[in-house]
């Protein structure tokens, strides 16, 4: 099968299907790809090829996810679908597959179920901006009751979105049957096109990483005799010009410096941008004043913090996690970008312990300040092995 060329002329958007088990997320994913393939905008994909999701690792955690890509008339989409509920939780918390928007699949025959609620909450916590709703399996209703039943479920789902801080009143809700569309029923194929149109119109194009303020996590530091100190790392976001000011943030008191040289692959550059692995020569910085785990950032755009709330997934024993629960006095290492920092945890909601496999919220207090902000991802480690993954939901101090 000829591979589709990656078309850079169309804006790129990352989306995913979320929702309760067996409500039809994977069938819908296959239906979108298949219906668009008839218009020459995608490769056709069957259910089995998506359901048989390959394993990938993110932050030391194994996650099963399927990635498919397709084009609408105006955009290029990367679409992620996960087979199991735990995979969704891990995927969203680790940011393995960033979502600019999500399609919430709800079986109209069941209405919202526990994981429907959990996925909406997770989407909110990890910063998914907008949700489009697909009410699935409407072909299961008799003709005379379909409209009423679908209307009731739609009201429920809109209420649920609003409850978790999404725009329940204005979110597009499309009702159809993923299975019928996949089987080639023209009426239901048209509904899939309607859904794609709703995603095109309602989910905003993400702000490109290069438009955000410059940030690079420091991976290594060395001295070049006669020239000064060089910090290397991958630029997380933004663009840096030669001779611009940056701040060294985290662990030690924040310090300002000027970047007098930018190198990549042994070549001198005038600028570094998101995605580059670069070496930055820093004016007037001693080798002892800077270390792995700090970040270089555009001045005043990020400050170090020691206390925050987080949403966390704790690995099961089978995933290489702990075999036993942990309690309030647990003090693991929190791994941010390039470094481990010890921290203490305080449970919310009156719980006494956290079991392997739990998805929980708690407050973390680090022993030294680290450059973090809402949405920053981290792993929790114990003796070098990953036992959990988290995302900062709220800064306390």
UniProtKB/Swiss-Prot annotation:
Residues 81-84 are annotated as: G3. Residues 10-207 form the tr-type G domain. Residues 19-26 are annotated as: G1. It catalyses: GTP + H2O = GDP + phosphate + H(+). Residues 60-64 are annotated as: G2. Residues 136-139 are annotated as: G4. Keywords: Cytoplasm, Elongation factor, GTP-binding, Hydrolase, Magnesium, Metal-binding, Nucleotide-binding, Protein biosynthesis. One of its GO terms (molecular function) is GTPase activity. Disulfide bonds: none annotated. CDD domains: EF_Tu, EFTU_II, EFTU_III. Mg(2+) binds at residue 26. Its EC number is 3.6.5.3. One of its GO terms (cellular component) is cytosol. Its main location: cytoplasm. It is found in: Cytoplasm. PANTHER family: ELONGATION FACTOR TU, MITOCHONDRIAL, ELONGATION FACTOR TU-RELATED. Belongs to the TRAFAC class translation factor GTPase superfamily. Classic translation factor GTPase family. EF-Tu/EF-1A subfamily. GTP hydrolase that promotes the GTP-dependent binding of aminoacyl-tRNA to the A-site of ribosomes during protein biosynthesis. Monomer. HAMAP family: EF_Tu_B. This is Elongation factor Tu. It comes from Metamycoplasma arthritidis (strain 158L3-1).
